[in-house]
Amino acid sequence: MKDGTGLREFQKEFPKRFFDVGIAEQHAITMSAGMAKEGMIPVIPIYSSFYQRAYDQVIHDVAMQNLPVIMCVDRAGCVGADGETHQGTLDMAFFRLVPNLTIMAPKDFKELEDMLEFAVKLNKPVIIRYPRGGEDSKVKFERHENIELGKAEVLKKFIDEEKSNKTKILQKIGDKVFNNKTQRERVTIIAIGKMVARAMDIGQRLQEKMDVEVINARFLKPLDDNTIIESIKKTKNVITIEDGTIINGLATAVKEVIVNNNLQGVKIKSYAYPDEFIKHGSVDELEKIYGLDEENIINGVNKS
């Protein structure tokens, strides 16, 4: 699978560090566990849907032994032309169940590089999931914070936090005069992986009507509870966006944070793939069908 996973050039440059075990995902995981046991740090790129075949080996040979194996989940999320059997919408859900696994998803190529470097140094089993294809061409992230275990990245702060003291005083006066009618709505948008770029687009479009905070979760496990709680306490209004199933992914994790910390009066709306097998179609077509496109999410926020 060196072509499908984009490793042909690596194989040419480092032939002695490259092993193609064929279509044998179970063997690939167990072999990697053995290599890790002997002091190496193996990196394994396998398609999301193919990890299902090696789930037993991930649990018993890697996670239970707490070995430093870096499992790269290629074709995560909707895969488009690869077809229904290759849709990668289940991996966050089934990996989140497994003890000892750290689960990450980068927002762009640079963050993927940073996560790989972080994973090599972590000395624990790691999942890094990423989609088929390239980056979102409309959004370019100029700032990249260092990767810290279980730490999210706040990409967009509230507009009113950037205002001068004079502006804030004038707004408070206006609030009193107009019976708080000048108070803007607030929303926290939490996204992971490729959907972070979409969250930023949505945040930019919504900022004329409301104050928006966009959080790049980075880690599904461990989730950055503190950053999420801090934001939710300010907004009481949460949107989650992910390219995985609605069950046991980011939406579930954020709802657990809200319930476990007894956060009252919080509205939450989640955008993810439904609890069904995703049909064949292009990524754009399927995102529109399942309500993950930008226009549908913006309309949903405006109606909430």
Spans of model-derived segments:
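Thiamine diphosphate
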Residues: 1-124, 134, ...
